[in-house]
């Protein structure tokens, strides 16, 4: 319309689209992840989870591991296992206390250096996107972008509740999310403001398989600009019993 505005039709929201059964959603995510050279694992109990991690670390001959912070990783408390396997762990630094709750520059530099020196980066994710087999990482998961991109091997852990069907659903959830998807933002719908007083989440990264590039001769090379190996481990609720 000339001289005016036209209201575009809204895109269909996830709640309007047919619901995909949870098991089918998981199968689709794993199939799409495999299609882009990722590796899917399922941990049905704590012993299975530790076995999967042990196998990955041994096969990659890892010595140094960079670990991000998020609620799932905190609940799992993987540090004792990693130490028992002889890993040198670098965990995203905790917030300070008292009058200075900000993470210092020296701590940030130290974690960045450790991430680039690590063989394996272990992170949580915000969502596992079934439509494309993508892992969705935001700046709400502290250290996830460094530890998912700098080491040559990325290991991501997620729960069934973090599986989403479509990009529309991811964007809808992010628009109302607090510091993590399960925590609503107190500043209202449509805001990307964090719910913990630490400011907005500044970025969202969609990790779809391994890093890959090709030159003019169309020779595909993996792992040049990021991890050449990506693992996604489903952590079932029975891992906590």
Where are these regions (language model features)?
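The feature marks the mature, well-folded catalytic cores of soluble enzymes
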Residues: 1-181, 197-241
């Amino acid at each position: 319309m000339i001289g005016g505005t036209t209201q575009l039709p809204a895109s269909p929201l996830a709640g309007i689209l047919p619901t995909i059964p949870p098991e089918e959603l998981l199968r689709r995510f794993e199939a799409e992840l495999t299609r882009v050279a990722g590796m899917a694992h399922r941990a049905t109990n704590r012993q299975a989870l530790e076995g999967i991690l042990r196998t990955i670390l041994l096969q990659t001959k890892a010595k140094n591991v960079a670990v991000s912070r998020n609620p799932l990783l905190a609940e799992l408390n993987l540090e004792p296992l990693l130490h028992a396997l002889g890993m040198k762990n670098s965990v995203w630094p905790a917030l300070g206390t008292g009058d200075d709750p900000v993470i210092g520059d020296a701590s940030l530099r130290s974690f960045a250096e450790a991430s680039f020196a690590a063989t394996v980066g272990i992170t949580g994710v915000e969502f596992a996107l079934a439509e494309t087999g993508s892992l969705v990482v935001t700046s709400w998961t502290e250290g996830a972008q460094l530890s998912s991109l700098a080491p040559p091997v990325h290991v991501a852990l997620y729960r069934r509740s973090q599986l989403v069907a479509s990009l529309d659903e991811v964007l809808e959830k992010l628009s109302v999310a607090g510091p993590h998807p399960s925590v609503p933002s107190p500043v209202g719908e449509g805001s990307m403001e964090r719910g913990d007083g630490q400011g907005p989440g500044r970025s969202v990264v969609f990790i779809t398989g391994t890093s890959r590039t090709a030159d003019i001769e169309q020779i595909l090379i993996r792992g040049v600009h990021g991890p050449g190996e990506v693992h996604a481990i489903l952590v079932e609720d029975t891992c906590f019993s």
